[in-house]
Amino acid sequence: RMLYGFEVSVILIVLRQILEDFDSNPTESQASYKYVTATEIKEEAELFLPTTFNRAKFEKDLDRYIDSIVSFGFLVEAKHAEGEKRYKIHRIIKEKVTLDDLLEFKNKLNDYDAADESL
């Protein structure tokens, strides 16, 4: 069992949620693969990752985390779309990040929000 860092784990959860939304959307069910751009991944991941004062470093770190996920086989680089990297979310991510993992992550976020509001 491979251990991932916090940031990579968060991005894996985000990708799994994107794939779950794709699979449960009847209008997109004719497509068999979900493609995302690097920008889409970053925008979703930023909601859960602490940003630093150095925006350029944060962007570079996100690129590095995405590259790691590609090397693990959860993302497959596809053709570039309008000069931007595009990735296919590999369905093996469903085996690594289960629906239970998604639920646990959401519950932890809710607990964190509740604790934050009580301060």
Please state what every model-predicted region is:
Residues 82-90:
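Minor-groove-contacting beta-hairpin "wing" of winged helix-turn-helix DNA-binding domains
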Residues 35-50:
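DNA-recognition alpha helix
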Residues 65, 89-92:
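Residues in the recognition helix of alpha-helical DNA-binding motifs
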Residues 2, 91-119:
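Short, amphipathic alpha-helical interaction segments positioned at domain boundaries
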Residues 66, 70-81:
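A short, conserved structural fragment
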Residues 25-33, 52-57, 77-78:
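Short acidic, glycine/proline-enriched loop segments that cap or flank alpha-helices
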Residues 1-34:
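Short basic alpha-helical hairpin corresponding to helix-turn-helix/winged-helix-like nucleic-acid-binding
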Residues 59-67:
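Short, hydrophobic-biased segments on the C-terminal half of alpha helices
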